[in-house]
């Protein structure tokens, strides 16, 4: 994205036009954000800024569009109607290193997500997530270890790559260019020639 377009988007979207600008904003208000963090389509994400000192995001974290991260709960607006007492609910959220949070996941307050964790699309994380695991569902539960997931992906990637090529050829009558197969590049290219960019 060129610089002028980026500046206009960030003005229109109040600093949420691109990942770099939004992360800069989060750091400025007090969120602890590590290195190599990408927030995809930040204007579609809802990261609680009410208590920025209660949120930590580690290194190599990828957060996809539609993700919500909450450090507080406003349900006291109902319970205070019972007796006039406001019962605050603020809790820390810690996301450790090498974490992938898929589209439309919700991370609730008082949650710690360990290292090397994948959170599935649409999941609602209400409890801590241990290291080296994949979580999914509502509420999110551990569905397998990261090692099991990695093995499963490696077993299916060739079959999926063939499906991508066949579908593309069927639709267009042409063989796809390499860039269409970016997820499968290491099936047919030397890994040493590439530095994979997220």
For every predicted segment, state its role.
Residues 29-30, 59, 92, 125:
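Short secondary-structure boundary/capping segments
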Residues 136:
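Catalytic binding pocket for nucleotide-activated donors in carbohydrate/polymer assembly enzymes
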Residues 30-34, 96-97, 115:
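Intrinsically disordered, low-complexity Ser/Thr/Pro-rich tracts
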